[in-house]
Each structure stands twice: as C-alpha cells, then as structure tokens.
C-alpha cells in the first residue's frame, strides 16, 4: 500500500471518528483496515463476520460518505473478513528467559521482559464451540508495567486457582482501549487454566456466545447449550461490548448468575467499564460492577520499551541474526504511543525490511518505515463523551444518569461537574453542551458552570476532585 493511500486512510478514519463519536468508533471501526483502492471501489477488512454485518447494516452510508469526501470518484465500499488465524498444535509453556541469558532479564526502569513462549496444549472445549486461541498469548509473553500490573496479578491468580477453591474476584472484569492487552490476558488465563486436566476453562468472544445461543434456539438445543455452559469451571468472555439482543443478554445474565452462584469463575473484558455499557441490561451491569473491575491504562514509555524488546526477542527465535539497536528501540518507544499493536507492527516492518534487503536496522531506516505510525505530539483533544465517562466513573453513576432528568443529589452534582468541565476543557458552545447532556437548555449549563465555579473557590474537597478529573482527561 502506498504512502498516499495510508495518508488518505488516516484522514478517512479521522473523519469517521468525528462523525460517529469516539465510543462508537472504538467499538466498531478501530479494527478496520484498508486493503486497497481501485478506481471507484475501496476494499476494507475487519476481523470478524459479526463486525462486517453490523457495519454494513448500520454504518455503510457513513463509511462511503467519509471516503467520498476524500475521493469523490469512490462509489462502492467492499467490506471483507480477514482470515482467522488457525493455530497449530501448541506445546507446553517453557519458563520465560532472555534469549541471550539463562536468567529472566529486567529491562531499564524495572520493566519485566519476557520472551514469547509457546502455549500449553488445549482443546478449548471445541464441543462447546470455543473461540480460537493464539498460542503466542500466554502469561509468559505478557510484558508488565505500571498500567497493567493489577490486571495481570488478578488474572494470574484466577488462572492458578483450583477446582473447589474459594473465588476471590468474581466476576473479574478488565476494561481498556484497543491494543492494550485485554485479549492477551484473557487468552493467557485460558491457556494456563487448561494446562492441567483439573478445570474446564472456556474462552468465547461475545460474538461467539451470541451466535452459539441463536444457533441453539434455531436447532432446538438451547437446553443443552445452557447446561454445557453452566458446567464450565471458568468462563472467559471477550469483547462484551458487542453483546446484542435482549434474549441473548437475558441468557448471558442467567449464565453469569448461575456460574457465580455455583462458585465458578467468570472473567470478562470490554473496551469500557460496566457503567458505560449502556446497551446492556441494568441487571447485567450491576452484576459485573459487583466483582473486581480493573482498568488497563495507556502504555507508558517504560512499558512500550519493554514490549518492543520482548518482540525483538521473539523474532530472534526464527531470525537469530535480527537485531534492533538500543537507540532505535528508544526512538520507537518515544514515537509510537498509541497501542501495543502498533509497536508489534513496527518490529515486523523492521524485520521484513532488514531480511528482504539484507540490511541492518538503523535509526534512519526506522524513521522511514514507521512514519505512518507516529502521531504528532499535540495536546489531547478532549471530547464531551470522554468527560461524561470519566465523571461517571469517578462518582459511581452511569453516563445515562448524567443525561437523564433525574434530580437526586448523587446525580445532580456529577452532572454539574461534567458540564463545568465541558465548558472549560472543550470549545463547545453552551447550547451544544446542553444538547449533549440530554437536550438541556443553555441556561441550565450556564447555571451549572457558575455553581461549580463558586463551589470550587471555597470547597477544597470539590476543588481537588475537579483537578483530579482534569488530570485524568488530559493524560
């Protein structure tokens, strides 16, 4: 793909993000890739059939219009499904070691480095239609840092439990943005849990759960489907934000309750906290919030450097002469800040260029090969949706509460704080802010802003809360 096409694709993605909003973009479009542009046709790809069908049904016209704003001659969008990875039979995990030393190595600034180990054997309960597992995604290959330490520790404790043990974190709910390691941890739990024969561990994407339930209804095997699921010792559900349909959500809620009440473990991942999963039934959100909810934050520079080093070590398993000098790793860690997938992609590009051209990796080569992955270092643009999400989490209310007409004290103050932050941290007008808060009048927003301004000047507790929220939004 040419640099021009990549630049166009970046602009189209930015236009699409502005059109649908950050939450919808993250849920449905973050994993969409550009495959090719030919005349009046653009070919895009997504990883699953579910994403393809949903985007075609709900967003096809918006995607086309965003492309036409860039290339007016485009009249057709072809959406395809990328081939799913078919794993070869894996072997048991080996102890994590550095490729050059027999002991585990520590990266600079305390980032733990691990080589990518192969995974233990597991059928993932194919009789129940478990989702495919990637043999690279084990605890051995997971790089820990400040932003993911708690999630890693909780997942590891769950994986090391035995049948009959008391369950401490149930459900364990992990949320994070795209490419920050949620799926890696969930699959690591599955591999480790299935390493022995004692416990039955099943990994399912929300899409797979949904399709399995619908298929069971059509074939009149719903009872067998339910009984099989409830016989699992550890149920692992990924991408919960994609769970759709009232009957499917009701069945998921029943399964969740049955497993937890029976002392079985449930592990779930999504791209947002339970309170922000507004498409889910209130009962499901309440049950999820009652467990351990852990957020995996953005990757700090130390962690990015650790991930890069681990990917280089993994590449050396098959390409022993491959080497990335330390200055290049430092540059990549500073320049590529979005997510772990971009970091892995950068190493793959350097490996390909080095091998195909028989050239050593240099800083100049790296700057040239990864320039489309480097984002300008500009202040983060804060959206009203971000403010609503962060404020709702801070005050333990839902985003829908902030948009509702409820006037209880535990909702009014967070709503006023959110409106105040929207006025001070964004360029939106008072009428626009009012519309984003459930269609309120601009005078309501003005009252909230003046109210919080007055309180902040004399209430140190509230002042500290507001400053904390500002820091969280600006990070």
UniProtKB/Swiss-Prot annotation:
Residue segments, region Domain II: 73-131
Provide the residue span(s) of the region labelled Domain I, interacts with DnaA modulators. 1-73
Key word Cytoplasm present in the record? yes
Q: Which GO terms describe its biological process?
A: DNA replication initiation; regulation of DNA replication
Q: Which UniProt keywords apply?
A: ATP-binding, Cytoplasm, DNA replication, DNA-binding, Lipid-binding, Nucleotide-binding
Please list where the region (Domain IV, binds dsDNA) is annotated: 355-475
- Molecular function GO terms recorded: ATP binding; ATP hydrolysis activity; DNA replication origin binding; lipid binding
Pfam families linked: Bac_DnaA (PF00308), Bac_DnaA_C (PF08299), DnaA_N (PF11638)
The residue ranges crossing the membrane are: none
| Record GO cellular component, one term | cytoplasm
Using the UniProt annotation, give all residue ranges assigned to the region (Domain III, AAA+ region).
Answer: 132-354
**Which residues participate in ATP binding?**
179, 181-183
| Localization of this protein | Cytoplasm
Q: Which domain of life is it from?
A: Bacteria
Q: Which family does it belong to?
A: Belongs to the DnaA family.
Q: How does it assemble?
A: Oligomerizes as a right-handed, spiral filament on DNA at oriC.
What's noted about domains in the record?
A: Domain I is involved in oligomerization and binding regulators, domain II is flexibile and of varying length in different bacteria, domain III forms the AAA+ region, while domain IV binds dsDNA.
- Briefly state the protein's biological role: Plays an essential role in the initiation and regulation of chromosomal replication. ATP-DnaA binds to the origin of replication (oriC) to initiate formation of the DNA replication initiation complex once per cell cycle. Binds the DnaA box (a 9 base pair repeat at the origin) and separates the double-stranded (ds)DNA. Forms a right-handed helical filament on oriC DNA; dsDNA binds to the exterior of the filament while single-stranded (ss)DNA is stabiized in the filament's interior.
Name this polypeptide is given: Chromosomal replication initiator protein DnaA
Species of the source: Nitrobacter winogradskyi (strain ATCC 25391 / DSM 10237 / CIP 104748 / NCIMB 11846 / Nb-255)
């Amino acid at each position: 793909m040419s640099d021009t096409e990549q630049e166009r694709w970046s602009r189209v993605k930015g236009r699409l993000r502005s059109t649908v909003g950050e939450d919808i973009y993250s849920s449905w479009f973050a994993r969409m890739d550009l495959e090719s542009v030919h005349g009046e046709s653009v070919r895009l790809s997504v990883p699953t059939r579910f994403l393809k069908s949903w985007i075609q049904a709900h967003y096809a016209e918006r995607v086309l219009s965003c492309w036409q704003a860039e290339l007016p001659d485009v009249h057709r969008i072809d959406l395809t499904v990328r081939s799913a990875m078919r794993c070869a039979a894996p072997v048991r995990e080996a102890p994590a070691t550095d490729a050059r030393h027999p002991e585990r190595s520590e990266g600079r600034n305390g980032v733990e480095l691990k080589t990518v180990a192969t995974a233990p054997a597991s059928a993932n309960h194919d009789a129940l239609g478990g989702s495919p597992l990637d043999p690279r995604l084990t605890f051995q290959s997971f790089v820990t840092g400040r932003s993911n330490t708690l999630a890693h520790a909780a997942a590891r404790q769950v994986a090391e439990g035995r049948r009959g043990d008391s369950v401490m974190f149930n459900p364990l709910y992990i949320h994070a943005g795209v490419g920050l390691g949620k799926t890696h941890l969930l699959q690591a739990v599955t591999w480790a849990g299935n390493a022995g024969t004692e416990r039955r561990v099943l990994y399912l994407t929300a899409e797979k759960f949904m399709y399995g339930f619908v298929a069971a209804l059509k074939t009149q095997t719903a009872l067998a489907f339910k009984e099989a699921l409830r016989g699992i010792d550890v149920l692992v559900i990924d991408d919960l934000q994609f769970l759709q349909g009232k009957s499917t959500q009701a069945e998921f809620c029943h399964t969740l309750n049955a497993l937890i009440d029976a002392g079985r473990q449930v592990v779930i991942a999504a791209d947002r906290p339970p309170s922000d999963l507004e498409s889910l039934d209130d009962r499901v959100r309440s049950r999820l919030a009652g467990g351990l909810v852990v957020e995996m934050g953005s990757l700090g520079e130390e962690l990015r450097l650790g991930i890069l080093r681990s990917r280089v070590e993994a590449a050396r398993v098959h390409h022993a002469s491959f080497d990335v000098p330390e200055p290049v790793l430092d540059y990549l860690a500073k320049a590529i800040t979005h997510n772990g997938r971009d970091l892995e992609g950068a190493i793959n590009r350097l490996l390909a260029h080095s091998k195909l051209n028989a050239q050593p990796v240099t800083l100049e080569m790296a700057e040239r090969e990864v320039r489309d992955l480097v984002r300008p270092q500009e202040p983060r643009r804060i959206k009203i949706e971000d403010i609503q999400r962060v404020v709702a989490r801070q005050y333990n209310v839902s985003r829908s509460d902030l948009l509702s007409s409820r006037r209880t004290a535990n909702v009014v103050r967070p709503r006023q704080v959110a409106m105040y932050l929207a006025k001070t941290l964004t360029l939106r007008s008072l009428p626009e802010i009012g519309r984003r808060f459930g269609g309120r009048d601009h005078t309501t927003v003005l009252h909230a802003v003046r109210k919080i301004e007055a309180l902040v000047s004399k209430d140190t507790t509230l002042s500290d809360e507001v400053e904390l929220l500002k820091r969280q939004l600006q990070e």
